A protein has these predicted regions:
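A short, conserved beta-to-alpha structural element at the edge of catalytic cores
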Residues: 149-190
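Active-site segment flanking the S-adenosylmethionine/decSAM binding pocket
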Residues: 105-161
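Surface-exposed cleft-lining segments at the edges of enzyme active sites
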Residues: 11-19, 51-56, 122
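Soluble or luminal CAZymes and related metallo-dependent hydrolases
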Residues: 20-28, 59, 63, 86, ...
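Class I SAM-dependent methyltransferase Rossmann-like catalytic core
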Residues: 1-40
C-alpha cells in the first residue's frame, strides 16, 4: 500500500506530483473558494476521505483538505457528513494534523444538510443511488444563496442536470476535472 501522498502532505509539502491522467478536482474547488475573495465561508461536504492511500487522492478527492486550508487562513467552518465512520476518521485525522477545525456528522447527509452554508459539495455515493441522493440533497438546499459543487456528473448528477434545465437554473460544467466532470451552481445570483 502506498501512503506517500498523505505522508508528503503531512510533512508540509504542497506541490506533490501524482502519476495519473485524471484531472484532479482541486482547480474547480479553488475556483469556487476564490469567488469569496478571502472572506470566511461555511462549507457542507458530503463524503469524507475514503482512504489515506495515494490511489484514493484522485478518486476520492480529499477536498476537505483544500477547504480546510482555506478556513484555516480566512475563517469559517467545515462540516463533513458521511455514513462511514472510517471515512470520517480519515478526515478527522487529516484536519487534526494539518491544523484546521472540522465538524463531523455520522449518518446520511440528507438528515443533516441545512440551509446554513455558503458552499455545498455534494460528493456522495456513485451510481443510481448517488444520482437520486444528489437530487434530493439539492432540493433541500435549492433556495439558499450558496454555491453548489457536484462531481462525477455521469454517476451523481444525471437527474440533477435534468432538473436544473427544467427549472432553468444555470450551472457551469467543468468537463475535464474529476471522474466524469464537475458542475457548479451559483445560487447567489438567482
Amino acid at each position: 500500500m502506498d501512503f506517500s501522498f498523505a505522508l508528503a502532505m503531512l510533512g508540509g509539502h504542497t506541490d506533490i506530483e501524482l502519476n495519473t491522467d485524471v484531472k484532479l478536482r482541486d482547480p474547480v474547488i479553488r475556483y469556487v473558494l476564490d469567488l469569496f475573495d478571502g472572506a470566511p465561508v461555511s462549507i457542507f461536504q458530503v463524503g469524507g476521505i475514503e482512504s489515506l492511500q495515494t490511489q484514493f487522492r484522485w478518486g476520492s478527492g480529499w477536498s476537505d483538505t483544500i477547504f480546510g486550508a482555506y478556513i484555516k487562513e480566512f475563517g469559517g467552518s467545515l462540516t463533513v457528513a458521511d455514513i462511514d465512520l472510517d471515512h470520517l476518521a480519515n478526515s478527522s485525522f487529516m484536519s487534526e494534523r494539518l491544523g484546521y477545525d472540522i465538524n463531523l456528522e455520522l449518518g446520511d447527509a440528507i438528515e443533516t444538510i441545512s440551509k446554513d452554508y455558503d458552499i455545498y459539495y455534494l460528493d456522495g455515493a456513485d451510481g443510481d443511488l448517488g444520482d437520486k441522493q444528489t437530487l434530493e440533497q439539492f432540493k433541500k438546499i435549492e433556495n439558499t444563496k450558496s454555491i453548489v459543487l457536484i462531481d462525477d456528473i455521469k454517476s451523481k448528477a444525471v437527474s440533477l442536470t435534468k432538473y436544473l434545465k427544467s427549472k432553468k437554473i444555470k450551472f457551469e460544467t467543468h468537463h475535464r476535472f474529476g471522474n466524469g466532470g464537475m458542475i457548479t451552481i451559483d445560487m447567489r445570483q438567482i
